[in-house]
Swiss-Prot record:
Recorded name of the encoding gene: DAB1
Compartments, as annotated in UniProt: Cytoplasm
Disruption phenotype: Nonmotile flagella, with paralyzed half-length flagella and disrupted outer dynein arms assembly.
UniProt similarity note: Belongs to the DNAAF3 family.
GO BP terms, alphabetized: axonemal dynein complex assembly
Naturally occurring in which organism (per UniProt): Chlamydomonas reinhardtii
Name the UniProt record assigns to this protein: Dynein axonemal assembly factor 3 homolog
Pfam families listed in its UniProt record: DUF4470, DUF4471
Organism lineage string: Eukaryota, Viridiplantae, Chlorophyta, core chlorophytes, Chlorophyceae
Function description: Required for the assembly of axonemal inner and outer dynein arms. Involved in preassembly of dyneins into complexes before their transport into cilia.
PANTHER family: DYNEIN ASSEMBLY FACTOR 3, AXONEMAL (PTHR22118), DYNEIN AXONEMAL ASSEMBLY FACTOR 3 (PTHR22118:SF14)
One of the record's GO cellular component terms: cytoplasm
Length: 710
């Protein structure tokens, strides 16, 4: 195991709905009647259990009970070994509740902040803005100030987050360390800072080269085999990850984590490349301080080193296990040609969208009859044979179409022009695709939200860039240039037509399907009316010009003004209709976000760090208080009796402990020994394995389930 892997940013098991750990049937009578249900997460490494439990609370009546005013229905206690881990936990919960960002972009931001080492510029600006908001929130809560109020704080979820957080078990020093971690997440030169105080505070933020930090970690891990790291990635995937299989599927089918995605993350730290954008800004919430402890030759503690801020995390085990391997929809596990049709990136994006949908509506997100499983907007290279075939067909069609258009426009010399075009079609298509990609880099297409007030930020930052050469044959590739050119040509023609016709309304809908359809219909109607008026104007002008040129010119001008006057009411009506529909959509979205914040108000998130036994589990107040517990794989030693997890668990409480099934540093035999040692520690700590028939739903083979011994 890597001794420098001192910080953990994600777990290696799927997210667990802690509500499934509650007893059902006759056992439900053992739950506290007038007290909230309590869950304890020991080193979850991220907020996946919290987000899943919040979103799926409607499935469990015990979490939806009406208790006295001011009393939550559920308390989630989260212990992390570092204050930075708690700060990241709160950050992901804040993104989920942020109603100022559309739901689709919110899910993408959450995945990027969770698993990417480098971000889009806009995502980095959002992190900067959210860090400032959380810093102000923590300072206010620590000082006993009233929570944020006002429409802006309500819409951005700050008021709901203030009601959700409980800092009563944190020491003053630990609160200060959380605030210090949030301050480090600021951008060195943010474009969204408008006030002098914010600019001066951000000036103290140190630059952070995540690309160099990632490369340094890889050099430390691989050592003298650094130059052959691609071979090591190939070995880890095919000899360790693939045999472990996919939850709920035959292990012979391999892993749903695609090799292209896994290799790209191992080499560059980008797990979710969801937009055709430039990922060139450091994910500053992945930087933490490393403190070395020193002992003399007798084993006596002789002090600690000064904390050094850097990247000290895992670069071997990918973050796809958290949200990308387990799914409630069986359509994502369809296999064709002995491989999964969907990948972990598709599953992760669907799972986050499903969590948001269920939190906002109280209903599960189900695929309709005949509806295709979700596919991410930009996959990393062709992931199926169907993708390869479609890309080849599109490239051939684009090349032949380019040659035909050039031949038709050449006139008498069309044959020679067609020959030249057919030979150089791919080069022209590549140039067009490159130009289009330069225009679309950085910001992503169709976004209507801004981070803070910096809406005019440049698309591509001047900081780091993922130092990636093009992958070799069979590796991750960008979309085919010819196919990109074939799709870019109609878009360019439509843009030219819309710019030349003043009667067609232009409107940014942010990608919402309803408003997009209404906009297209209104534009078509306005274009038809303008075309009819222009045709009548041209015919009248031509007939008049044959008799009297001067009169014909004046008649054509009059007809043109009449056509514009006739189209003006239609144009204004279309704009008003689209504005009304957009307002209705925004009102509906705001209502859904308000409902999500109301459901989250039934919970309290209690943050804990430091000595767990002294702060929480060893206190008489919490004896037998927790109905369910979870434990991370790097902290299985806390099953020992001295940490008193069994003493804090209620009778019959269940513990979900992450095992080493997906730890790539261990072979299958070593992972089996790890599981056997876990069982030994659990038995000594007062836990016994839960029979397989009683295993709660949604918990995969990546975790062991124990029940408190009587």
């Amino acid at each position: 195991m890597d001794e420098h892997n001192v910080h953990h940013f994600w777990g290696i098991s799927p997210a667990v709905d802690l509500g499934t750990l509650l007893p059902t049937g006759d056992g439900a009578a053992d739950l506290p009647v007038d007290q909230p249900v309590r869950f304890l997460q020991v080193a979850p490494y991220d907020a996946r259990h919290t987000l899943t439990t919040l979103s799926r609370a409607c499935r469990h009546p015990a979490l939806m009970r009406q208790l006295p005013p001011g009393q939550p229905a559920c308390r989630l206690y989260v212990w992390e070994d570092s204050p930075e881990g708690l700060a990241r936990h709160v950050l992901l919960a804040a993104v989920l509740l942020d109603g100022g960002v559309p739901a689709a972009q919110r899910g993408q931001l959450l995945l990027e902040l969770h698993g990417n080492a480098v971000l889009r510029r806009r995502a980095a600006e959002y992190l900067d803005e959210k860090a400032r908001q959380l810093e102000s929130l923590f300072v206010g809560l620590a000082a006993g100030q009233p929570p944020p109020a006002g429409p802006e704080a309500e819409a951005r979820g700050l008021a709901a987050l203030a009601a959700l957080l409980d800092l009563s078990l944190l020491k003053f020093q630990e609160k200060d360390l959380i605030v210090e971690a949030l301050q480090r997440w600021r951008l060195p030169n943010p474009t969204s800072s408008t006030s002098t105080s914010a600019a001066s505070a951000s000036a103290a933020a140190a630059p952070y080269d995540m690309v160099a930090a990632w490369d340094g970690r890889c050099r430390k891990v691989y050592g003298e085999r650094y130059d052959f790291r691609r071979n090591m990635v190939d070995w880890d995937y095919h000899m360790r990850l693939q045999p472990a299989g996919t939850p709920g599927c035959d292990p012979a089918s391999g892993s749903i984590i695609h090799f292209h995605h896994f290799r790209h993350w191992r080499l560059h730290g980008v797990a979710h490349e969801l937009r055709d954008s430039a990922y060139n800004s450091a994910n500053r919430c992945r930087g933490e301080g490393g403190v070395g402890e020193f002992k003399d030759r007798t084993g006596r503690d002789v002090g600690r080193s000064v904390s050094a801020w850097g990247f000290w995390a895992d670069v071997l085990n990918s973050p796809y296990h958290a949200f990308g391997t387990a799914c409630e929809q069986p359509e994502f596990y369809r296999i064709t040609n002995k491989q999964f049709v969907r990948t972990a990136v598709d599953v992760a994006e669907h799972n986050i969208a499903a969590l948001l949908h269920e939190l906002r509506t109280g209903r599960r997100l189900e695929l309709g009859e005949g509806q295709e499983a979700h596919r991410a907007q930009a996959a990393r290279g062709p992931t199926t044979l169907e993708d390869l075939t479609a890309a080849a067909e599109e490239a051939a069609a684009a090349a032949s179409g380019a040659g035909a258009e050039a031949g038709a426009g050449a006139g008498p010399g069309g044959e020679a022009a067609a020959g030249a075009s057919s030979s150089s079609g791919k080069e022209e298509a590549a140039a067009a695709a490159a130009a289009g990609k330069e225009q679309g880099q950085g910001e992503g297409q169709g976004e209507d939200w801004t981070a803070g007030s910096g809406s005019g930020a440049p698309g591509a930052g001047t900081g780091q860039a993922v130092a990636e050469g093009r992958e070799g044959p069979g590796g991750p590739q960008d979309s085919d240039p010819a196919a990109a050119a074939s799709t870019a040509a109609p878009a360019a023609a439509a843009a030219a037509a819309s710019s030349s016709s003043t009667s067609v309304p232009t409107y940014s809908s942010g990608g919402r399907a309803q408003v997009a359809k209404a906009m297209a219909a209104a534009a078509a109607a306005a274009g038809a009316g303008a075309g009819a008026g222009a045709e009548a104007s041209s015919s009248g002008a031509a007939s008049a010009a044959s008799a009297a040129p001067t009169a014909g010119a004046s008649s054509g001008a009059a007809d043109g003004k009449a056509a514009e006057a006739a189209a003006a009411p239609l144009d204004e009506a279309a704009r008003e209709q689209m504005a009304a529909e957009e307002a209705a959509v925004r009102a509906a979205e705001a209502a859904l976000d308000a409902a999500a914040r109301q459901r989250a108000g039934r919970f309290r998130l209690v943050l804990v760090t430091g000595d767990l036994a002294k702060t929480l589990t060893g206190r008489a107040k919490y004896a037998g208080a927790f109905s369910g517990l979870s434990l991370g794989h790097r902290h299985t030693h806390m099953l020992e009796p001295q940490y008193k997890l069994a003493a804090a668990a209620a009778p019959g409480a269940r513990l979900v402990a992450e095992n080493a099934r997906h730890v790539l540093q261990l072979s299958q035999e070593q992972a089996a020994l790890f599981a056997a040692k876990m069982d030994e520690l659990a038995a000594a700590g007062g836990w016994r394995p839960l029979p397989a028939a009683q295993r709660p739903p949604g918990i995969t083979e990546a975790a062991a389930v124990y029940v408190r011994a009587a």
